[in-house]
């Protein structure tokens, strides 16, 4: 199921305490709701991939520019056409009851 009402923001970030707080705080300060968050370390653990599910909004472009300026954010990708069912079935994949 492809969903165009939401965007998937994919981030490559440095992995250390406080990174997620800095990133989510940027959204909070702009009263922008995160619909979903998934984060996992990759490689040797020095970096992580974060996936943020957000509604299509006119302020998103400005937030992306601000994310790119954060020291701990190494890469930002914005995906409009993605399979939304990934987030719907994540609880089954992770075996969350």
Please state what every model-predicted region is.
Residues 1-97:
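A conserved regulatory-domain signal marking ACT and ACT-like small-molecule sensing domains
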């Amino acid at each position: 199921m492809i969903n165009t009402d939401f965007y998937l923001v994919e981030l490559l970030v440095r992995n250390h305490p406080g990174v997620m707080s800095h990133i989510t705080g940027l959204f909070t300060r702009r009263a922008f709701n995160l619909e979903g968050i998934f984060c996992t370390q990759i490689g040797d653990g020095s970096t992580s991939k974060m996936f943020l599910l957000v509604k299509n909004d006119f302020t998103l472009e400005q937030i992306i520019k601000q994310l790119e300026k954060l020291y701990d954010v190494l890469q930002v990708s914005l995906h409009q056409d993605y399979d939304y069912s990934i987030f719907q079935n994540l609880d089954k994949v992770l075996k969350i009851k």
